[in-house]
Amino acid sequence: MEGRRLYPIGIQTFSKLREGNYVYVDKTELVYRMTHGASGYIFLSRPRRFWKSLLTSTLHSYFEGRKELFEGLAIEHLEKEWTRYPVLHFDMSTAKHMDKDRLLSELERKLYGYEQIYGRDESAIYTNQRLESLIKRAYAQTGQKVVVLIDEYDAPLLDVVHEEKELPKLRDVMRNFYSPLKACDPYLRFVFLTGITKFSQLSIFSELNNIKNISMLPEYASLCGITEEEMREQMGEDIGRLADNLGVTPEGALGALKSNYDGYHFTWPSPDIYNPFSLLNALADSKLNSYWFGSGTPTYLIEMLNKYHVKPQQIGARKFLAESFDAPTERMVDITPLLYQSGYITIKDYSSLTNLYTLDIPNKEVRMGLMKSLLPNYLHQYTADGLTPVALLFEAIAGERMDDALRLLQTFLSTIPQCDNTDYEGHYQSLLYTIFSLLGMYVDVEVRTPKGRVDMVMRTPTTLYVVELKLNKTADIALEQINLRNYPERFALCGLPIVKVGINFDSGRHTLGDWVIEGSMSC
């Protein structure tokens, strides 16, 4: 371990990172640009564990004029004055899982901490009055305009985003708290708010109509996260260690990191952005694992997936206008805005002709994590042990033994209690989609052809499978439909051998009844 670099895993305080000689990916040129733009009110949305808190802490140190922390960084040569401003930094992550009264108490506690520094106007009773008084007193006592930093502004609301009764109550508390910011404009140097989701300006910042949302601006695409160039420049030695552990070349290790943790884009065009939490953990441990997803899938996400009756295949590649996903979550009519803003889907392409963005799951880690979370919707009493048969399935399919794979699947499904209402074909289509996605395969459903829709298309690095499903019929009927409608013709230019698979499910036994596989045809 001697000589290994220190990665700031879980460290969100800029001063601790710099003083502890941890690896820091320099974002300070963007920090300088952001703090010297036309707008002094900035909002940034990024998924959890994407260094939003570290960015907020960086701003805190910068506005406190702590030049010594920025030695060797880009901003050292850009900033000439290093003025010390009074900073009010509110971390709202401590206000999760609270009702209205506890939330008010938590806000009062935060205000009290700064009132110990700048004093309190006893006539200011409510949280909005106390915040306004704090800003004015800090300005009067220091002679400098005040910086307000609000990290995870939406944390008090995320747990109740699906609760129609509780959300308005907590939203009103937060709206009241933020309300003085516009009136205090003469006393403010900079206001920065960051969080995961985008709540409507009217609902939270009804008085603050001059916030600039930089979440989808190309110049800030890499403000949070790590680009491939940054990774190659600063982490090459540890990529080599990972390669040794995996038994591959450094380029092979880079490919594995890319497929597992890369693929985020928050605008278009944009460099590929790696999930910083997963990437740094993988390099620190010299192994691949489900770090980001394993660190905690929010309860609210699973509850919203169920509320909107989201099927696994609905999370794949789809096209949207920006206002359909970069939209306030409390007004959403489907789950797309929440999935996008939470980092479970991301931008993959954009058409300037139609203004449509293609959104898809960013990488293998997120895809497998999502499917693990959704599998219990189809299988009762599902546990992590259930992944062992899935791993055996992967081994069979990787060896091009589809017959063995389906036999394993038949046994697996027959031994696990199923959910209710399984007597329709779509249930089994969703179940297969989820399981085969867990294997890391490319899976698509209801694929259009000139003569109808294919139930499912699966692709491995070596083979393309055209699959037709039937319920309480026969596999021969399914295969006959594939041949009659000549579905494989649609994929003639795929460059892979095509295998036709007819599968019949037996709803009485809750598993595969029979199947038939027709050998590969080269395309």
What label would you give each PLM region?
Residues 1-424, 439:
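Phosphate-binding site recognition
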Residues 138-142, 435-461:
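Active-site metal-binding core of divalent-cation-utilizing nuclease and nuclease-like domains
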Residues 147, 463-465, 499:
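Structural motif
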Residues 432, 456-471, 485:
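Conserved catalytic cores of phosphodiester-cleaving nucleases, focusing on short active-site segments
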Residues 490, 496-523:
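Domain-level recognition of nuclease-like catalytic cores that cleave nucleotide substrates
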